[in-house]
């Protein structure tokens, strides 16, 4: 059962990101305007190099926009955001439990509270039995579970995810997609999720943002009408799913062709 939604609200207005100056300037993001509702699961798709990851890094505070405004409302939360990358980023010399609790340790959370929160996070992702394992003893899917637990244990208002399941095999990807949706529904957090997969965006997201080729702009924002929980096999048999997937594919195809034409000029 889902909880009352309470994650961060995000307002982005006229955001631009430019690398370099003068004739060498590279416009990565151009006039991005976007509202993300509290507790929304927002997916972003776009051609390679369109600025998806740059936008996520700016939201995370790991990079700074050149101009424009970002307003994140996360009142009552100790931690504004946490980020999960394609690589789990678990420290190889730490056991799983220590990896998951690292963010709590660096914030000076008392040891007793750390232990309780780490155990809860491990249980959430199904890693309780592997708490004393090292990352090299885990499968790729289990390492990503650890990364998700590490992100959730700090109780962030929003979760920023940059293609977290892209390197996994189809079976593990499907399992973790379902787990992520379950955890999201239980927690009420806001999720911003980057993917190259149209199917994944339609499987997970409330809305899908389609970005243009560089410079990255928002080309279209598409509502995903299918109720959660979603099953990819069932969705694939749906005519509405097929039409929506084709619509997004055509939007992306136009951008890929435009980018190729620019290169070949």
What positions do the PLM features span?
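Conserved signature/switch motifs of ABC ATPase nucleotide-binding domains
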Residues: 133-136, 154
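Short coil-to-helix segment of the ABC ATPase nucleotide-binding domain corresponding to the Q-loop/switch region
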Residues: 94-102
């Amino acid at each position: 059962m889902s909880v009352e939604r309470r994650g961060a609200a995000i307002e982005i207005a006229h955001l631009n990101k430019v690398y370099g100056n003068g004739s060498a300037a590279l416009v990565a993001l151009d006039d991005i305007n976007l509202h993300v509702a509290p507790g929304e699961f927002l997916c972003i798709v776009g051609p390679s190099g369109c600025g998806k990851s740059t936008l996520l890094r700016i939201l995370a505070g790991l990079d700074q926009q050149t101009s424009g405004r970002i307003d994140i409302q996360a009142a009552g939360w100790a931690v504004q955001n946490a980020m999960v990358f394609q690589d789990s980023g678990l420290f190889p010399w730490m056991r799983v439990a220590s990896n998951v609790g690292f963010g709590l340790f660096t914030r000076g959370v008392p040891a007793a509270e750390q232990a309780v929160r780490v155990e809860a996070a491990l249980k959430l992702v199904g890693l309780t039995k592997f708490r004393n394992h090292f990352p090299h003893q885990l499968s790729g899917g289990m390492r990503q579970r650890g990364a998700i637990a590490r992100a959730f244990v700090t109780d962030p208002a929003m979760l920023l995810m940059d293609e977290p399941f892209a390197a996994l095999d189809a079976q593990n990807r499907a399992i973790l997609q379902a787990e992520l949706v379950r955890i999201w529904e239980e927690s009420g957090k806001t999720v911003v999720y980057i993917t190259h997969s149209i199917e994944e965006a339609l499987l997970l997201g409330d809305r899908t943002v389609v970005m243009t080729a560089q410079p990255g702009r928002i080309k279209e924002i598409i509502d995903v009408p299918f109720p959660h929980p979603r099953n990819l096999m069932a969705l694939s048999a749906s005519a509405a799913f097929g039409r929506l997937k084709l619509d997004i594919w055509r939007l992306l195809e136009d951008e890929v062709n435009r980018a190729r034409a620019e290169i070949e000029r």
